UniProtKB/Swiss-Prot annotation:
Binding site for IMP: 13-16, 38-41, 128, 142, 223, 238, 302
Organism the protein comes from: Lactococcus lactis subsp. lactis (strain IL1403) (Streptococcus lactis)
Protein name (Swiss-Prot/TrEMBL): Adenylosuccinate synthetase
CDD domains in the cross-refs: AdSS (cd03108)
Major localization listed first in the record, in broad terms: cytoplasm
InterPro entries for this protein: Adenylosuccin_syn_GTP-bd (IPR018220), Adenylosuccin_syn_Lys_AS (IPR033128), Adenylosuccinate_synth_dom1 (IPR042109), Adenylosuccinate_synth_dom2 (IPR042110), Adenylosuccinate_synth_dom3 (IPR042111), Adenylosuccinate_synthetase (IPR001114), P-loop_NTPase (IPR027417)
GO molecular function annotation: adenylosuccinate synthase activity; GTP binding; magnesium ion binding
Length: 430
């Protein structure tokens, strides 16, 4: 019953899609357990880039099952477009399975997302305006529409009318905005449901049957621990639980069936949108890292904020997600820097040092990073295939990251390609 969870340990964009794609070669089922099409991951296969937002990375292996679990909020229109995009590039989605319990994102969710964000003025949290938060709000309020409802014309019509009445009152009275007409949504989205019907099933049964049969199952998270609604930099977070614990809720698989948790991180840190970022760089070094690392959001296209590796963040991620292994990506981006830094602790204005990540944003704003400086390296390391092939300074950097986080490094990457991911220890035991 081997199962592996892949989680982002920073603020997303750590290269989870790349690592999931890499680990998928030894998995038989690959499942997504939370988030929506606000997440974006880029996978490079034979030099060709594929950008996905909803469909699990395992879709590139036609003999494997790819699952969108019940914890995902699904935009049917986006999903159909993604299936078409894959088909145009010679990739079939026949192995895709969608949970009938997953909640559906509808146009009123996206509109509400936009209006709520605009109303915050300079206190915006940096949402992607994909309707993710409002869809999860409806889910928690027990008024959401699930995929199973979308497939039943009578139920969909009844629930859509009820929800639209409530949402339109909110649009008109609270935001002085135009209402959405029932006819604008109903037929179009019912038809989307019919197009997706062949993929819809009880995915919890598929996942548990696979695990009980001894098959290898890989769970793929979106975003990262620091964007988790409970464990992240609240309120600058997403509306779901990217932490490993989110797997059990978002896939219908019990916690006793999770074998290993692989935390994915970059050799530096990045973040899209607003919110705390203790090691953020505003100088030429930051600009160099952004440009060399192509740090622009897959979903939004926005330039990402970048900074030094933060071991305080990483130890927090280790604790709340129970990391057993680490995948360290983008080491090559740091090539050419004379000195590289790692944050080892924070210092408060009163001189006190702390090694944990504060919950209070006010307390966090009072903290400055304490850095350990290491020699950089100038060599091109993109063709290195073993730890021994790395320059001594790069090897020392990799080892120091593992020591400070306190987790074994199972893979390190020196570029975006599959062949540039190097294994130090197999998480599958093969």
């Amino acid at each position: 019953m081997p199962s592996v969870v892949v989680v982002g340990t920073q603020w997303g964009d750590e290269g989870k899609g790349k690592i999931t794609d890499f680990l998928s070669s030894n998995a038989e089922v690959i499942a997504r357990y939370q988030g929506g099409d606000n997440a974006g991951h880029t996978i490079v296969i034979d030099g060709k880039k594929f950008k996905l937002h909803l469909i699990p990375s395992g879709i590139f292996f036609p003999e494997k099952i790819s699952v969108i679990g019940n914890g995902v909020v699904v935009n049917p229109k986006s999903l159909i477009e993604e299936i078409a995009y894959l088909a145009e590039n010679g990739v079939s989605a026949e192995s895709l399975r969608i949970s009938d319990r997953a909640h559906v994102i509808l146009p009123y969710h996206k509109k509400l997302d936009f209006l709520q964000e605009e109303a915050k003025g300079d206190k915006k949290i940096g949402t992607t305006i994909k309707g993710i938060g409002p869809a999860y709000m409806d889910k928690a309020a027990r008024v959401g529409i699930r995929v199973a409802d979308l497939l039943d014309k009578e139920i969909f019509e009844e629930r859509l009318r009820t929800n639209l009445e409530a949402k339109n009152r909110e649009f008109v009275k609270m935001y002085d905005s135009e209402p959405i007409e029932f006819e604008e949504i109903f037929e179009e989205y019912y038809e989307y449901g019919q197009q997706l019907k062949k993929y819809v099933t009880d995915t919890s049964v598929i996942l548990n049957d696979a695990l009980d049969a001894g098959k290898r199952v890989l769970f793929e998270g979106a975003q990262g621990v620091m964007l988790d609604i409970d464990q992240g930099t609240y309120p600058f977070v997403t509306s779901s639980n990217p932490v490993a614990g989110g797997v059990t809720i978002g896939s219908g698989v019990g916690p006793s069936k999770i074998s290993k948790v692989v935390g994915v991180c970059k050799a530096y840190t990045s973040r899209v949108g607003d919110g705390p970022f203790p090691t953020e760089l505003f100088d030429e070094v930051g600009h160099q890292i952004r440009e060399v690392g192509h740090e622009y959001g897959t979903t939004t296209g926005r330039p990402r904020r970048v900074g030094w590796f933060d071991s305080v963040v990483m130890r927090h991620a280790k604790r709340v997600s129970g990391l057993t292994n680490l995948s360290l990506n983008s080491i090559d981006v740091l090539s050419g820097l004379e000195t590289v830094k790692i944050c080892v602790a924070y210092e408060r204005s009163n001189g006190e040092q702390i090694t944990h990540y504060p919950a209070s944003l006010k307390e966090l704003a009072d903290c400055k990073p304490i850095y350990e400086e290491l020699p950089g390296w100038s060599e091109d390391i993109t063709s290195c295939r073993t730890l021994e092939e790395l320059p001594e300074a790069a090897r020392n950097y990799v080892r120091r990251v593992g020591e400070l986080v306190g987790v074994r490094i199972s893979t390190f990457s020196v570029g975006p390609g599959r062949e540039q991911t190097n294994v130090l220890e197999s998480v599958w035991g093969v």
